[in-house]
Regions:
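General small-molecule cofactor/ligand-binding pocket signal
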Residues: 36-38, 78-82, 133
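Short glycine/serine/threonine/alanine-rich loop segments
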Residues: 27, 33-34, 75, 99, ...
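Structural beta-alpha unit
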Residues: 1-2, 16, 70-102, 139-144, ...
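Gly/Ser-rich helix-loop-strand patches that form or flank binding pockets
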Residues: 93-143
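Short, well-ordered secondary-structure micro-motifs
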Residues: 20, 47-50, 89-92, 114-115, ...
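Short, conserved glycine- and acidic-residue-centered signature motifs
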Residues: 17, 57, 117-121
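Small/aliphatic-rich secondary-structure junction motif
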Residues: 2-55, 140, 150-155
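Short, solvent-exposed amphipathic alpha-helices that sit
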Residues: 23, 53-67, 89
């Protein structure tokens, strides 16, 4: 059994990503683990509602990130904003900080869409030095329902 003391929850603020949050919180409570909530900011991608100015955008994303808080105040939470390629930064951050488990959502893209856009979750599963739990929101399910779960472990 893997001892889980540090959990990383990377988010892109989508309903798919939010779905994994329930699992990250539950696991943090169960194992008495700390939780790091990570958003990787990509400056060359325009996001509706986010400022165009790079410095203002960083402030905006940091504010969005810090709004994510577990109801249980006993869970130690750290918010981290990084810049770069999401999959690479998630993997690097997990390795550099000794994360035991990454809990993340997936959009569940298939076919041409996946080929063109790639899969952050797939790259993290492939490259992470720790175990990864991927939560997929079933089609047509409201975001309050828990989704399907896939786990890949590393020793």
């Amino acid at each position: 059994m893997i001892r889980v003391q540090k959990i990383l929850y990377p988010t892109d603020f989508s309903s798919y990503s939010n779905q994994a949050y329930f699992h990250a919180i539950s696991l943090a409570e169960k194992h008495g683990a700390s939780l790091t909530i990570l958003f990787v900011y990509t400056p060359d991608i325009v996001t509706p509602g986010a400022p165009d100015n790079e410095e203002q955008a960083k402030v905006y994303w940091q504010q969005q990130l810090e709004q994510i808080r577990p109801l249980d105040a006993r869970i130690p939470v750290r918010h981290v904003l990084l810049e770069g390629d999401p999959a690479s930064e998630i993997v690097r951050f997990g390795r550099d900080t000794g994360i035991d488990l990454i809990v993340m959502g997936t959009h569940g893209r298939t076919g041409l869409e996946r080929l063109l856009l790639g899969s952050v979750a797939e790259q993290v599963l492939r490259d992470a030095a720790c175990s990864v739990l991927v939560v997929k929101l079933p089609k047509g399910q409201p975001t309050t329902e828990r989704g399907d779960v896939a786990v890949a472990g590393r020793n």
